[in-house]
């Protein structure tokens, strides 16, 4: 409707109740000419002359003549005057309020709208404050009850996704995570309101509208009519369509059509497209088979469109050529083809509430697990309380979820609720390396209320004295870490506080005392979380300090960015941190071998390191690092007995807690965190991404020593491997870093015995090949070493010693040239530890008569051979 001849005021000159405020965007002034809002056309006033209809108490009603019009609803764009907040009665003068009450008053009769009909009859409808109309500026939650903001809801990509797409974030981090905004501006920003006045006589022709102010001023910006039979502002719940895209469409880097409010590829008039993601096609045979990791294929020509819309909405598609294609939603949802160029299939709505329970088969006890559910079209079906799309950005999702390639999972404590579609539903449930993973297909019917799944614990290594652990987890809350640990079968989770430039994480979770999940702290003692620290320097390296008591070992980082802040001087070395950790009863671990290769060499030579860690964010992407193991071999080859541990270094939802983990044999010890640390120090460990492996050499376990006479002898090596999913492909017997024997495996378990003649001191370990993702060369497991002394002679490889010495020399060079000093005395003291390590290893080279070469190092050595 064109209201130009009825406009009687300038919105810019409206009274005090309509004045702009700081934080306004000027959006109201952009409402000019013909515009569409929430899929409805409105004609707004131009900048020339009056541009709004002001209804003022005492003034005669505005009568707007209509051509003969059949309408079910009349829609008004309008706003009431801001009403100053009044102090509550009886309080006198009051201070600032955290939650102001602007817009909360309700029920006053702002105006009366009359519908006049061609037959001469008339109907009056009251327009009440905060029902059909609301003021411009409102406080949080002061929504109108029967009107919507004119602004429609918008959908946002997450902050990380915007960066992937090469554009600036469209919303702040929080809104990006929420992925939506309602259109209501509260606390800051301006609003106008859209009200659909129902016509009680839709079968009678309208001839005019009569708008009369009652108790206060209001402004009418625009009016339109509709013949829709259902309320034009009431949308349906979420629905989905599987759409085969016409030619000319390309999915973005996320595998989606861009539904961000800045996008142009897809949209709806009377509704909102929530997402348009590529169809994921799963192999039914693989799903029901023995494959470790069943990934779907992302389809480039079909998308699942999820939306909330009015039944009479239209879907719009715009391909690369810019032409706009329109399709009636009723036709699409009816299952027919809207046109020859658009093939659609309805996706059964997920509306059946189902309780999911996960039990242990033998005991019937409810157990935590990792759960994935998807529908017949590959659509992910998260339980209530979890994201429909897991955010894999670093430091962006701590919600007990996991994204493994294209599969998404939630962590549940044995029970959850999910809205599921009728028909086949695909379920995967995992619970660590001793429980057989479950993949199945269940049929949901109209009578399905509960799904109960039983998990079969087929391996019993825990009962044999083994416990599993992840030495390296970040960002999760202790309770979330405890849940994920339970669900992944990880008995010990080490959650590490850390510094990242100016960012500090998990610091408030550290108290130097609490072991979450322990019996002393209200748990059952079977799954534990302990907060330690990862203390870090960009050049000299990182060190994990686990389980220490008392005060936090600070600084968490130093020596400048990125680990510390710019300008943060070198006020500690890793040796300094390690000594303090030992003094406070903790376990010192060198994380994520082989990097950074610098001071770790000195600290190992000084005997300050209890274990060395191999790291894998997610075994599907990369398993146990050959480079990290080669670095560990180097230290074993010069006589430093370091147990192996493993951790995930989890920093995002794409990293799997316990994906690479340590198994530690407690033996006769009770399971406590302190006993776990002692067991790690004793060295009977193995690391794995699936297969469990045990080895003895002449009955001695890893961490132990076999002594032989100077003449040597033949050693008997016994081993066994068991797995619930990742098959061991072959077993390699490693001696001093070299493969001496190789045995092929078949199936999920194997065992054997080898004889090995030995005539010099060495170390022996088992390395297991096998893959989560089907890569033949992947390393799936590795034991710590058994040490063999022949005639009391040491293990010492000169080339490895020289390599380690060079790392120490490099660390000294850094301290002498680039390290930002605190003060001379402290710097000299810190440097002295590195000099001591250099002296010890250098002296050992001379003591053993090993010829070696020094690299030129600033102020330490000149180039020479001896």
Model-predicted regions and their roles:
Residues 1-299:
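N-terminal/edge-of-domain interface segments
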Residues 50-51, 83-85, 133-134, 216-219, ...:
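Flexible loop/turn segments at secondary-structure boundaries
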Residues 72, 352-354, 713-717:
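Structural beta-strand segments of beta-rich domains
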Residues 75, 347-363:
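A short, Gly/Thr-enriched small/hydrophobic beta-strand-prone motif that recurs across taxa
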Residues 156-188, 387-415, 511-520:
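Surface-exposed acidic, glycine/proline-enriched linker/cap segments
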Residues 217, 251-254, 265, 270-300, ...:
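C-terminal functional module detector
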Residues 228-229, 346-353, 455-468, 688-689, ...:
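Short domain-boundary/entry signatures in modular proteins, especially
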Residues 434, 462-644, 648, 654, ...:
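Catalytic cores of extracellular degradative/oxidative enzymes
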